[in-house]
Amino acid sequence: MFDVKTVSLEWGGKTLTLETGRIARQADGAVLATYGETVVLCAVTAAKSVKEGQDFFPLTVHYQEKYSAAGRIPGGFFKRERGATEKETLVSRLIDRPVRPLFPEGFYNEINVIAQVLSYDGETEPDIVAMIAASAALTISGVPFMGPIAAARVGFIEGEYVLNPKQDVALADGRLDLVVAATDTAVMMVESEAKELSEDEMLGAVLFAHDEIKKVIGAIIQLAEKAAKDPWDIDLSDNTADIKKKLKDLVGKDVAAAYKLTDKSARSNALNEARAKAKAAFAEEGAQTQMVAMKTMKKVEADIVRGAILKDGQRIDGRTTTQVRPIEAIVGFLPRTHGSSLFTRGETQAICTTTLGTKDAEQMIDGLEGLRYENFMLHYNFPPYSVGEVGRFGAPGRREVGHGKLAWRALHPVLPTKEEFPYTIRILSDITESNGSSSMATVCGGCLSMMDAGVPVKRPVSGIAMGLILEGDKFAVLSDILGDEDHLGDMDFKVAGTSEGITTMQMDIKVAGITREIFEVALRQASEGRAHILGEMTKALGEARTELSAHAPRIETLQIDKSKIRDVIGTGGKVIREIVATTGAKVDIDDEGLIKISSSDLTQIEAAKNWILGIVEEAEVGKIYKGKVVNIVDFGAFVNFMGGKDGLVHVSEMKNERVEKPTDVVKEGQDVYVKVLEIDQRGKVRLSMRVVDQETGAELEDTRPPREPREPRGDRGDRGDRGDRRGPRGDRGPRREGGDRGPRREGGDRPRRDRDDGPAPDHMPAFLKSDD
């Protein structure tokens, strides 16, 4: 029933198995990839014809994580997988970016690549497995895919490169989380987060990954030899030479003149005029010819721009290849935000704000590994007005999610620990102008806004986007590329970092032939550019502010003994709710006894802190505390102090002079200062008010004269003056001998008095005297 084909190899200490022929047999290509106990199914389908009038390549990649893969049921009301999560969107982009350039120009058939995680072992990251499965499925599908590619994750732990570590382990135990996708001969994509690694260390990691990737590519080729379908028979020959020549003759000079205009709007208008002129020249041709002519027009523009850069080193806006556009940075220009910056580089501009919050503002993330919370968020928005266009404005798309995550990776390594800075941090970046490298503007502006908010970052971070023009043996690396240079170039290479090293690197390469020499030149040139940008940022703000904004919440942390946690929380949360309701501060306590008290009002924090300290601390003899009278009795008043302790102020300790009644001095609910005089063995606390200034709480000198010592009882003489005190027995008469009581009965009871013994004694109640 099944014609199953399988290949396996040992890779990174685990077995990687690629299988086809058992599942999803109606797809053009389907591969089940197993690595460890993580299993990913990837299926590829392709439309057999091109939609009429279509002039682009509609490749769609979907990556989905099934909760059942980890033995979990989705949380929330709807118990099924919903729309793509941020992680699923990012992995979809990871698959798309290295695959898209490997389809031939002019191939416009729609292709769907769907990767689903079916099993997850908690150790092997499924994104790498999905990228390998997608490449294998495309390779055996028969579509004109010029692969295969493969992918690998690299960590840098204790000075050694490690293949395919778990993602969180890579950064917890090491300094690097790097994903590389490549063909057998060329690196196609790099995505990374690093803890200030040097350029050489980053380059070494990329080359290490490429060597390991080649092993997987060999396995994919083996699978294709066993199971690949016949390649599609399509005509992709370039028959546009005549059209291209006609366009160059017609509008070549107009295009060259347009690209010499340094202003983006003026340049765009001039190019649109040239395109309209070209379109008019083919107005009498058929619709297909017109479409081909306009596609060829883009090639004409690319040839003119690329030729000028390679031949003369002349860029679109007149800069040299290493020159960075003018930069202006402003901080604190939004009065009510916790931190803000306006970062402008040429015609790219970002408004960045930083907002500080408490623990309850953390982002809840539900995934295969369970529920977790993230205390650092960065959200990137790209409205259509930023490029002078009319377009959709609403929920973020894949591009916005990807750019935001890139900036997040750049800034995350320099954040303080939760212990150093217990705030939730959210950076919002709104791109207000864009002409290249808006994600790196977000890095620079986001860093400045955090510093303006008082976030103690380790070091400032700057970022730069690099480009590449490659023609044969000639190449030019461009610093701080424009949008047009990005579209017309062969590489988009973004690097961010501090003065000490790289924190993130992202690379998308559109052509083969990127050599180590080109990598080294690009990294060196990027380092120089980052240093220049960092200098410009320092002019606006050199280091993080030492004070938080007046509008930001304050958080104080308090560590208590674990045994005291239940005392602070109370039965059913009664105590902690009372603290919050009374003081107005937020109080969070974790299982380790770390308490976070937060409020925008410092007096509320202080009140809650003192309350908690009163619960967990022991009173000290001789120390003065502020308390509240909670009960008044005849002999004194009970005072509650340290939040949860009561002590007695005896009436004699209220004032130095005599006090008749405690209510003459205090009343219930009154705040008083008390000094601890004594704590007995049972924990009872004796307090004094008279030795404390009730206005200031300062200790007073005890001015009460000491009591005169009593005469010792042994010196009271023979006490003869007291007389004989009513004689030997006074009026009671002589003590009876007891004989008239009679002997006790056997049961120990006295004999009952006989009525004939005489009249009842006078002291007896009347009802006992009665004879009735």
Swiss-Prot record:
One of its GO terms (biological process) is RNA processing. GO terms for molecular function: 3'-5'-RNA exonuclease activity; magnesium ion binding; polyribonucleotide nucleotidyltransferase activity; RNA binding. InterPro entries: ExoRNase_PH_dom1, ExoRNase_PH_dom2, ExoRNase_PH_dom2_sf, KH_dom, KH_dom_type_1, KH_dom_type_1_sf, NA-bd_OB-fold, PNPase. GO terms for cellular component: cytosol. Residues 553-612 form the KH domain. The keyword Cell inner membrane does not apply. Mg(2+) binds at residues 486, 492. It is found in: Cytoplasm. Belongs to the polyribonucleotide nucleotidyltransferase family. Involved in mRNA degradation. Catalyzes the phosphorolysis of single-stranded polyribonucleotides processively in the 3'- to 5'-direction. Keywords: Cytoplasm, Magnesium, Metal-binding, Nucleotidyltransferase, RNA-binding, Transferase. Gene3D superfamilies: GHMP Kinase, N-terminal domain (3.30.230.70), K Homology domain, type 1 (3.30.1370.10), Nucleic acid-binding proteins (2.40.50.140). It comes from the Bacteria. PANTHER family: POLYRIBONUCLEOTIDE NUCLEOTIDYLTRANSFERASE (PTHR11252), POLYRIBONUCLEOTIDE NUCLEOTIDYLTRANSFERASE 1, MITOCHONDRIAL (PTHR11252:SF0). Residues 701-760 have a biased composition (Basic and acidic residues). This is Polyribonucleotide nucleotidyltransferase. SMART domains: KH, S1. Residues 622-690 form the S1 motif domain. Its EC number is 2.7.7.8.
